[in-house]
Amino acid sequence: MKHLTEMVRQHKAGKTNGIYAVCSAHPLVLEAAIRYASANQTPLLIEATSNQVDQFGGYTGMTPADFRGFVCQLADSLNFPQDALILGGDHLGPNRWQNLPAAQAMANADDLIKSYVAAGFKKIHLDCSMSCQDDPIPLTDDIVAERAARLAKVAEETCREHFGEADLEYVIGTEVPVPGGAHETLSELAVTTPDAARATLEAHRHAFEKQGLNAIWPRIIALVVQPGVEFDHTNVIDYQSAKATALSQMVENYETLIFEAHSTDYQTPQSLRQLVIDHFAILKVGPALTFALREALFSLAAIEEELVPAKACSGLRQVLENVMLDRPEYWQSHYHGDGNARRLARGYSYSDRVRYYWPDSQIDDAFAHLVRNLADSPIPLPLISQYLPLQYVKVRSGELQPTPRELIINHIQDILAQYHTACEGQ
């Protein structure tokens, strides 16, 4: 199951191919991704972050073993072969425990790595870039690399213990700013310099040697860098290839290495393709997929209001707003401005903090109510044209069933299609 190593080999041979990573735990997003990969007969890379999923449950309430079981069960139900499914762990390190002393945070990180590897995750992003309670700010490359090497050793031992061989594929390094979109308004972003990328690589190579891990270097397939892409609440910084030329050329000197780009959400299809051509050949996407889910649900809620008496409506949007106001912890520190600005951000921000609320039981009940209301009788075509125009074209051509669920999934797949096209290669 060396899909990633083979992808890198082909890319280094000039194929200009890549792979996208679906970073979401939402069942409809995952179903959309599995069905899309199945239809296109491609492997599928699904990643969990250290915030979402950890040995204590993360914010999803799932351990790595739970997440794997959930994804594999979904794949089985959709007849997707498990050997075409790659599970990755993103930003694995002391990220969740920065408020603890480094010794304690790293002990937790050891256990985090063990839980991911034992559960069968094969793509492991080692990220120890964050300072803990008693650390200097920022950490030196050497400290970051030493901690990553420590975790790599734990990962290798765990993999051999559980699977009889060490076949993990690693990603190292980190992008700045923090995972999940920038908190501030952006105008321009500094691209990682070739010297900084080389320093990260050399520090890691040296630290891995000290741990006796020379042999795993060919399995370090990617370095996370900042190619100059990011988004905030209402803006996207588009990829500018010319600004990343030196960085792109630098990786050509490394035989088994490509770059991984985070926060590629909302880039244009042309930018996504150019990123892959420029060796940023692993494209991470998450918020853009749940943003598309939210768009589809808001559109269906508007259709429901046209068709269903007010008393019988799901009230999905109002339920969502009420829950977000009752439990503001996932958006309050991100969204600023007056009451109206924050209301708009809660519903529409590119950073899509609303994604943290979909599992809430009240919201889930309203979602189920919405789907029931619209599944009772066919949705009139003019309303699909009004609120989901891209799906309307497919409904009219006969390639899409106009049921609520299929409309949602297809809308998400429109985003996946952009990533698929960007990664196809020549």
Swiss-Prot record:
Pfam families reported in the protein's UniProt record: GatZ_KbaZ-like
Pathway assigned in UniProt: Carbohydrate metabolism; D-tagatose 6-phosphate degradation; D-glyceraldehyde 3-phosphate and glycerone phosphate from D-tagatose 6-phosphate: step 2/2
Domain of life of the source: Bacteria
Any one GO CC term of the record: plasma membrane
Its job: Component of the tagatose-1,6-bisphosphate aldolase KbaYZ that is required for full activity and stability of the Y subunit. Could have a chaperone-like function for the proper and stable folding of KbaY. When expressed alone, KbaZ does not show any aldolase activity.
Subunit structure: Forms a complex with KbaY.
Protein's name in the database: D-tagatose-1,6-bisphosphate aldolase subunit KbaZ
Species this protein is from: Escherichia coli O81 (strain ED1a)
Lineage start: Bacteria, Pseudomonadati, Pseudomonadota, Gammaproteobacteria, Enterobacterales
